[in-house]
Structure formats: C-alpha cells, structure tokens
C-alpha cells in the first residue's frame, strides 16, 4: 500500500472554524437594531423593483431579491430591506404580517451581522450610565432570534421561519464562542453542545414542513458539521462531531430521496460525500498511527472513500476548480490504499491528475509537481 496524502491541502476535510476568545454574550436586545448607521460613501446600488407600489409585501420581496441576487459585498441594500421592514411593522402595528415578512426581517438581520464588528474581549468593568454600546454582530443575531420567535408564535410550522431559526441559532453559537475569555471557553463550549442538538431538531422540523429545500438552506447543515468539530476540539469530547455527522448525513440522504431541484440535489451529494470523507479521514489517521495496517480499517476506509467519490462525482461541474481539487484529493487518498503500482492505484491517480490539470487551467493553483509525482508512481 502506498504512502498516504501526497501534499494537497485537505480541502475535503471539514474545516474547523477558529473559535476566538472574549466575554460572555450580551442578552438579546429588546428592539430591532436600526440600519441607518452606514457611513459608507459608496453610491447607492441600482435597484429593480418589479412589484406594484401599493403591494407592500411585494415591494419588500422585490427589494430582498435585489439583495440575494447581488454580490453581497456591501450592506447598503440590506439597510434598505430592514428599513422597509421597520416601516411595515409600524404600519401594521405588529398585526396581520405574513410569515414571510418575519423570515425576511430575521434573515436580513443575520446578514447584517456579517458586516458588523465582532464584540471584542474586555475585562469586566463598571459601565457608566451614559455609555452607548456600539452595534456589534451579536446584537444583530440576538435581534434576528427575537424576530424569528415573534414570527413562530403566529406561524409555528412555517418552514422558512424554522430554517432561519436554525441558521440564527448556529450564528448565536459562533457569537458566544467568540465572546468568552480563554478561561471560560471550555465551559461555554459545553453549554453550546445542547444548542447544537437544538439546531438539529429545528432543522429536522423545518425539513418536515418544507415543500422544498434550497441550497442556501442546506448551508446550515454543512456549517453544523464544521462547528461540531470545533466544539469537540475545545471540550475534548470525542462523540460530538460523530453524532452530528450521523444526523447531517441522514438529512442529506432524505433530501436526495425527495428533492427534485438540481442545485439542491448536487449540494446534498456533496454533503453526503463530505460526511463519508470525514469518516474516512479518521480511519486514515488510525492507519497512520499504527505500525502495521489493519485490514478491516483499510477496507472500511476504502468503502467510505469510494462512497465519497461517487457522491462527489454526481455533483462535479466543469467550472468549479476548487471542488475538482477536493475530488482529486479524495481520489488520491483512495488510490493510496491500493497496492503500489497496481492497476487500481494507477486508475485513481490518473483520475486525480485529470482534475488537477483542469483546476490548474481554471487558475485555482499550481499542481505541476503533484501531477509529476502521481504520474511517476
């Protein structure tokens, strides 16, 4: 059996997000945060509003669509969306607003959090009564959670609201883990594990009530896999990511069994492939630690790698060079588990080389040295 990983970045591995240190998170704000603090000198983006001027929700939907179809590199449109939500809220006095209104409002607040500064670690100190706290990302997340809960009080089975809630709870974990001191980090991570389980339950409920699942909604599942690995590394509890992985793979497989949208299906295939790859990775680590390769471990690693490749190939596109590198890495690892110079090894190294050449043509990176090494083997 040949040497394992040949030097590529393991893009197929679940990336463990860095959990910064700081203080405990603030309590949820009582009111939604005003969007009118954007001091950017950028010109206002061109907007296309295709709804009747008398149709308030239609106007909001149209404005929000401008945001979701934009480059998302500036909060200007988002501020407009939130301002429109505030106006509708005042006009309706909180009554008669549809579930979609609350969904757009909460989702926009979560997106605004991405543009706000993170709450920085500070030592505990007395706060003067005239101190004004700057708007930080955790405040937007808290406001989004409050908004989505308001919507769910009226529409408890609305899938869109439930999907946004799962995303908000996930972002809340990120905020809390980035707002604790080094000393409190482990204890906070332990508390976040229960919230991780809650997110899985909320997503499961959303999936149950949804007529369809979008690729964007599936992002939460991918992020949960990454987050579980990060929490596991903090609390040193080995079953956190495994439990999450099983649940997430089940979500992906259920979507593959029922979803018709091509983009969602491709994303689900990548999700299953990622889950299989993570399992294989842990098995490869065991093989690296052992002086002699255990046949059962090798076969189990092969099984998971083969499954990962099959799912990855079903989601492969000619334009996604970065994913080609991920697939090539998986094929190399699979080829490494066969006898050196065997037909199987040559086959999978050859398939990997094809992807690396294409990725290089697309400008993803330089892989000439890796390609030469694979072709020499």
Swiss-Prot record:
What GO terms fall under cellular component here?
Answer: nucleus
Q: Where in the cell is it found?
A: Nucleus
Its GO biological process annotations read:
positive regulation of SREBP signaling pathway; regulation of translation
Bias (Basic and acidic residues) occurs at 19-34
List membrane-spanning regions: none
Respond yes or no to whether keyword ATP-binding is given for this record: no
The ranges of region (Disordered) come to 1-72
Classify the main location.
Answer: nucleus
Q: Which UniProt keywords apply?
A: Nucleus, Transcription, Transcription regulation, Translation regulation
- Name the source's superkingdom: Eukaryota
Q: Does the keyword Nucleotide-binding apply?
A: no
Provide the function of this protein: Required for correct translation termination and probably involved in regulation of hypoxic gene expression.
- Describe the family membership recorded for this protein in Swiss-Prot or TrEMBL: Belongs to the ETT1 family.
What is the protein name stated in its UniProt record? Enhancer of translation termination 1
Organism equals Yarrowia lipolytica (strain CLIB 122 / E 150) (Yeast)
Identify the coding gene.
ETT1
